[in-house]
UniProtKB/Swiss-Prot annotation:
It holds the Pfam family F-box. SMART domains: FBOX. Residues 7-53 form the F-box domain. It comes from Arabidopsis thaliana (Mouse-ear cress). This is F-box/kelch-repeat protein At2g43445. Keywords: Kelch repeat, Repeat. Kelch repeats lie at residues 146-197, 356-400. It comes from the Eukaryota.
Length: 405
């Protein structure tokens, strides 16, 4: 009996040491080690390890962008690094015009008759039907996020036109269930964002309101107190440093100003109190904003560095970085389709009998690595050199700086 207890303790210590070693390994090595043994796979797919790894990777956020061309029609992952300071961009080979939602490194892409959920880090893909009686897709209001209590990822689909249908899909079980009706009718097309276990939608009509859905309790709340003096149709709702944030570009005299406000939640019993504080007020040089009255322009924050520098992009495919210490704006890219910030996530997407299968060429469960002309073809001498020396293909970009006027 004593010998069994010692053996048990020994195995526990070994597993604990393995976990610490795995935490510091690059993603490619971790994915390979999953195939070594059942014990290693169990450690690497455990909720504890996945959460610890995700927390560590939050200190190294990347940017997820869409890349599309006529050469490759099948979706694929294009790992490509573009460094400006500590900024790294990972490319997903997909149609940039397709609606997409992201949460913690997972991407939900909608297409006619399907929801596609992809883990960019592991390459796992799951496809789901839109549920019973979904109504026309053009009438859907969608959301995608993570239940912070159970860790489960969920898709929300609401229809306010022709039929009133409100459903929520559990990615793990693959089953749809009904949601209670929200307290407000929302405008179709409102973009959603998930922050700390809740999905938020911004409604801009006669009045301003943010609709919030708690993914664990599956209940709705309304956020009514907004900085209403500057909320417009171009206001962007984002997750910035695990806080809900609003971004709006306004013109003050001859100057354009990018203002970003962050929301804090104070919970007292069953009630919640929402307050807003201004995080950034950035003067945009005239070369950043073209003052043409017929041209709409808005900016969306992506991430904030440890130094307080802000990465953001506009609706004309330009990516910028604002350096708070020197009050300068640098253009990182002039032609990029930013999807969102991206954090490595090893959360497995289980494939169960309840999931709907649909053939994607050779596999229903994997996105391929794309063979686009932008990168060396597999087997070429360039490809061999690249694979031997670096994990990601590096692209040097010459940036240019916008100094304040």
């Amino acid at each position: 009996m004593e010998e069994e207890r010692e053996n048990t303790n020994s195995i526990y210590i070994v597993s604990e040491l393995l976990e610490e070693i795995f935490l510091g390994l690059p993603l490619k090595s971790i994915l390979k080690f999953k195939t070594v043994s059942k014990q290693w796979r169990s450690i690497l797919e455990s909720n504890l390890f996945v959460e610890r790894r995700r927390t560590l990777q939050k200190n190294h956020p990347k940017i997820l962008a869409a890349y599309n061309c006529d050469y490759c029609t099948r979706p694929g992952i294009l790992p490509k690094s573009q460094f400006e300071g500590d900024e790294e961009i990972v490319y997903l080979h997909t149609d940039a015009t397709q609606p997409s939602m992201t949460c913690d490194g997972l991407v939900c892409i909608t297409e006619p008759g399907w929801f596609n959920v992809l883990n960019v880090s592991t390459g796992q893909l799951r496809r789901f039907l839109p549920g019973p009686d979904p109504g026309p897709q053009a009438n859907w209001l969608l959301g995608f996020g993570r239940d912070k209590v159970t860790g489960k990822y969920k898709i929300v689909r609401m229809c306010f036109h022709d039929c009133y249908e409100f459903g929520i899909l559990d990615i793990e079980s693959g089953e749809w269930s009904k949601l209670m009706s929200p307290p407000h009718i929302m405008r179709v097309g409102s973009k959603s964002v998930c922050v700390n276990g809740s999905i938020y939608w911004l409604q801009i009509s006669v009045s301003y309101i943010i609709l919030a859905l708690d993914l664990h309790q599956e209940t709705f709340n309304g956020v009514y107190h907004l900085p209403a003096t500057w909320v417009t149709q171009d206001t962007q709702l984002v997750n910035l440093e695990d806080r809900l944030a609003m971004a709006m570009t306004t013109k003050v005299g001859p100057e354009w100003i990018l203002e970003i406000w962050s929301m804090d939640i104070e919970e007292k019993g069953w009630s919640k109190r929402y307050t807003w504080s201004k995080a950034y007020s950035i003067s945009l040089a005239h070369r950043v904003v073209v003052s043409w009255p017929w041209q709409k322009r808005w900016f969306t924050p992506v991430s904030v560095s440890k130094q307080g520098n802000l990465v953001f992009y506009d609706n004309h495919k330009r990516l910028f970085k604002y350096y708070s210490g020197t009050d300068e704006i640098r253009c990182l890219s002039s032609n990029i389709n930013v999807i969102s910030s991206y954090v490595e996530n090893l959360a497995p997407l289980p494939l169960k009998p309840s999931h709907t299968h649909h053939d994607l060429g050779n596999s229903n469960s994997k996105f391929s690595t794309s063979r686009c002309h932008l990168f060396p073809t597999r087997g070429s001498w360039i490809s061999k050199v690249f694979r031997r020396n670096v994990l990601f293909t590096s692209l040097v970009v010459v940036g240019y700086i916008y100094l304040p006027l």
